[in-house]
């Protein structure tokens, strides 16, 4: 007797638009949506806080030694998993209907995003490592000069070496490799969330936390930019271009003025707006497009 033919079984994620449009009921749908969005908001708050703590404290607190070196080298180890978690919380990584579907050149969308993120993470870690190593070398040379001032007269080239580590590796090469990696990571996150729609935020508390995440993202861009050579000019152009693109994109899909319907994209747009305001205030305060060292602040 011929065996009964069974149609292939498909597993649907109840958050996906496809499962909702098919009318698949879920008694836990509302709670799951709420918890899912809460997780994203928490990540959007915690991630910039961690990066700010690791990047800003050494600027205002002058501490040397092994503890300071470990502190600086720890930043990518902590921040990169948080950055990755933001991306993998998107429905691209959680909707089972997306699994195995060819996206481009034989890669699934998840595979493409993982490769994309890893390229950014590699640059981010390399830049952070180069920056931290240059600081160690700079402090070591300064300590030698302080202990033996006569060495500069005997070996004037030591000033050139110090300049190379401070301005060549720390302030320019390390900073910009680090920043390019962060930009690539952020673009991977935005690409992962480009089609994703959320239920929106229905409480004042949730709205304030969500806005706080965007403000922190903007503070990160604004405060870090003033550390870079020509950083204020670079970030001014960057946030204007990317912010304009996000504005047009969200406006096109009628999500620009909603409360969290495009949770991540709107949060980043808030951040770029805050960063733009910070940089404009900075330029006005220092009377020009200067970084922190050029302005003579906290040097």
Language-model regions, residue ranges each:
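N-terminal topogenic module of multi-pass integral membrane proteins
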Residues: 2-157
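Alpha-helical transmembrane segments of polytopic membrane proteins
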Residues: 42, 69-81, 127, 173-182, ...
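Hydrophobic alpha-helical transmembrane segments
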Residues: 160-187
């Amino acid at each position: 007797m011929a065996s009964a033919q069974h149609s292939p079984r498909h597993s649907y994620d109840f958050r996906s638009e496809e499962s909702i449009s098919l009318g698949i009921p879920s008694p836990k749908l509302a709670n799951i949506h709420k918890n899912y969005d809460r997780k994203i908001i928490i990540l959007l708050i915690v991630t910039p806080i961690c990066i700010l703590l690791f990047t800003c404290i050494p600027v205002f607190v002058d501490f040397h030694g092994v503890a300071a070196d470990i502190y600086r080298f720890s930043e990518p180890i902590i921040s990169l998993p948080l950055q990755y978690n933001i991306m993998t919380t998107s429905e691209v990584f959680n909707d089972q209907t997306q699994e195995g579907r060819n996206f481009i050149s034989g890669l699934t969308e998840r595979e493409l995003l993982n490769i994309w993120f890893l390229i950014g993470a590699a640059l981010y870690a390399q830049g952070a490592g180069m920056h931290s190593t240059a600081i160690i070398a700079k402090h070591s040379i300064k300590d030698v000069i302080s202990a033996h001032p006569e060495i500069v007269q005997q070996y004037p080239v030591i000033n050139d070496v110090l300049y190379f580590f401070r301005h060549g590796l720390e302030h320019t090469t390390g900073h910009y490799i680090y920043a390019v990696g962060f930009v690539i990571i952020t673009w991977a996150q935005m690409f992962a969330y480009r089609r994703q729609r959320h239920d929106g935020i229905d409480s004042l508390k949730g709205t304030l936390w969500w806005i706080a995440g965007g403000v922190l993202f903007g503070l990160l861009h604004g405060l870090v930019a003033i550390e870079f050579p020509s950083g204020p000019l670079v970030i001014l152009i960057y946030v204007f271009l990317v912010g304009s693109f996000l504005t047009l994109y969200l406006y096109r899909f009628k999500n620009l003025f909603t409360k969290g319907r495009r949770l991540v994209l709107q949060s980043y747009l808030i951040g770029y707006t805050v960063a733009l305001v910070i940089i404009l205030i900075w330029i006005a305060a220092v009377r020009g497009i200067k970084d922190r060292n050029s302005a003579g602040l906290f040097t």
